[in-house]
């Protein structure tokens, strides 16, 4: 068996190596493995056996890697944090995209902040009501290598309804005159020195994002880990921040195996957006092309039924996310090395 060995970049992003010794080989003909280790906290790491490293480097904005893992297939890693895995990304992306679109009476236009791998756009474009999707990602390099290697999303990138913009989502959303039925935050986790944390702040939600929502418009964002031990990292503060800006806010969670944790999303609007279970399933049947692999009405009801610990934490949270008072996931972005 191989041993996971890290050689760390200056900002803590691990380079993957292979180490061997006679005691690590169970059989004389067994191949040693490369392993990737993700640091979850100072005293906790997850390890993933690799087939190969498809891409690894540093763009202008973030450290990026695309790994071919034995268990989860191709995996996108940004600033040392797994963002998406081929085998189970459908859980994350179906939960991120479909509830908001199904709760809206007739969604036609969507703006995606981030989403460079193309999976969010793929799910949105399954909806027959959609006329236009703007996907705005800051990092051309991420988009380019995802288009090359994540072929499952090739149809989305070629769809005439998709407008791809390489730019800071905050600046792009601010300059646009149109309004959108749905705005999606498919952003990397907020890490210190990363490019995304400003897009989780109250000032951004209130002054830039909310004015770009059409009547009945819904905003939904990924909100980080939401497990028993991890929900206070950013999940509860993102939820509370959105409560300061929107009249109706709903949090929901699901377990994502490749993240080794429960994940959280938060949806918000100034217009009530709940629908009955039967109506939600009816809309899936009428509006969505193809079969969803994870989400149906009962599974969403389950996702939005939070356990006592998480419910109380959301209720008691007082922190409001701001540039001066930001919470971060463990780790550092590219800009941190220049601080």
Swiss-Prot record:
Alphabetical GO biological process terms: auxin polar transport; phloem or xylem histogenesis; polyamine biosynthetic process; xylem vessel member cell differentiation
Name of the protein this chain belongs to: Thermospermine synthase ACAULIS5
Lineage: Eukaryota, Viridiplantae, Streptophyta, Embryophyta, Tracheophyta
Top EC class for this record: transferase
Family, similarity comment: Belongs to the spermidine/spermine synthase family.
Tissue expr: Highly expressed in stem internodes and roots. Lower levels in young seedlings before flowering and rosette leaves. Expressed in the vascular tissues. Restricted to procambial and/or provascular cells during primary root development and early leaves development.
Gene label: ACL5
EC number of the protein: 2.5.1.79
Source organism per UniProt: Arabidopsis thaliana
Phenotype caused by lack of the gene: Severe reduction in the length of stem internodes. Increased thickness of veins in leaves and inflorescence stems. Altered morphology of xylem vessel elements.
Location of the active site: 186
Entry GO terms, CC: cytoplasm
């Amino acid at each position: 068996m191989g041993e996971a060995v890290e050689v760390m970049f200056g900002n803590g992003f691990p380079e993957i190596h292979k180490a061997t010794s006679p005691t690590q080989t169970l059989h004389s003909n067994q191949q040693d493995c490369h392993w990737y280790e993700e640091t979850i906290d100072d005293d906790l790491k997850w390890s993933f056996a690799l087939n190969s490293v498809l891409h690894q480097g540093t763009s202008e904005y973030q450290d990026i890697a695309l790994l071919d893992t034995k268990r989860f297939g191709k995996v996108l890693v940004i600033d040392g944090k797994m963002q998406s895995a081929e085998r189970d990304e459908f859980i994350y992306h179906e939960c991120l995209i479909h509830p908001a679109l199904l709760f809206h009476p007739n969604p036609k236009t969507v703006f995606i902040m981030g989403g460079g791998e193309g999976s969010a756009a793929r799910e949105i474009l399954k909806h027959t009501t959609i006329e236009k999707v703007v996907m705005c990602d800051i990092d051309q390099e991420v988009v380019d290598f995802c288009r090359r290697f994540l072929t499952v999303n090739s149809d989305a990138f070629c769809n005439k309804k998709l407008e791809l913009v390489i730019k800071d989502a905050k600046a792009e959303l601010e300059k646009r005159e149109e309004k959108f039925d749905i705005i999606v935050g498919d952003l990397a986790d907020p890490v210190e020195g990363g490019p995304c944390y400003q897009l989780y702040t109250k000032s951004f939600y209130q002054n830039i994002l909310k004015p770009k929502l059409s009547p009945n418009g819904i905003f939904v964002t990924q909100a980080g880990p939401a497990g028993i031990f991890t929900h206070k990292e950013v999940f509860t503060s993102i939820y509370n921040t959105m409560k300061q800006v929107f009249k109706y806010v709903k949090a929901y969670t699901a377990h994502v195996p490749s993240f080794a944790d429960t994940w959280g999303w938060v949806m918000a609007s100034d217009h009530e957006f709940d629908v009955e279970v039967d109506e939600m399933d009816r809309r899936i049947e009428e509006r969505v092309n193809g079969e969803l692999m994870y989400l149906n009405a009962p599974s969403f009801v389950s996702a939005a039924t939070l356990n006592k610990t998480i419910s109380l934490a959301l209720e008691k949270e007082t922190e409001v996310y701001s540039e001066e008072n930001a919470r971060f996931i463990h780790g550092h972005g590219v800009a941190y090395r220049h601080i």
